[in-house]
Amino acid sequence: MTEELCRQLREWAEAYHQADFITNDPVQFPHRYVRQEDIEIIGLLTAVLSFGNRRMILRKVDELDALMGHAPLQYVLSRRWENDFSRENQRSFYRMVSYAAFRTYFEKLYAVYAENRTLEDALLAFQGNPMQKLCAFLGVSDRSPQKKLNMFLRWMIRRDSAVDFGIWRRMSPADLIIPLD
């Protein structure tokens, strides 16, 4: 890595790894919570919806948070999502994601928290690095950049930032990647 690139990366890190960055970023949603399970749930769902216009993302995740009664774990375990996200509902929930398609995230999260205390606990049963574990859990390819999922992993694993949580202690920040396009 060149000196110039190192300098630029440090500059960006200093600019974006500040608490005031949280206010207008999707990471604001998991920052509303203190319980690990709530942070994991809203964090994953926020990351999955983090594509397109930032204002639209913030509006949709705020709507989702309200729908969950600002209690993600309780919402998942209560199975209220079965009514809110019907298998038959092909209408758009957010951009090209239908209600039926988004339901699969709730199904997976329910399975996790019905059997495990945390999502981190569930992921440790899978082989590979954190991205491979998360992709295996979600049933998606780990061969594409998966920028949204890498962002989620960064939030959960990195410990040296006002933005990230560092609540997953059994996975190493050294195993995180930064996808570039």
Where are these regions (language model features)?
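HhH-family (HhH-GPD) DNA N-glycosylase catalytic core used in base-excision repair
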Residues: 1-181
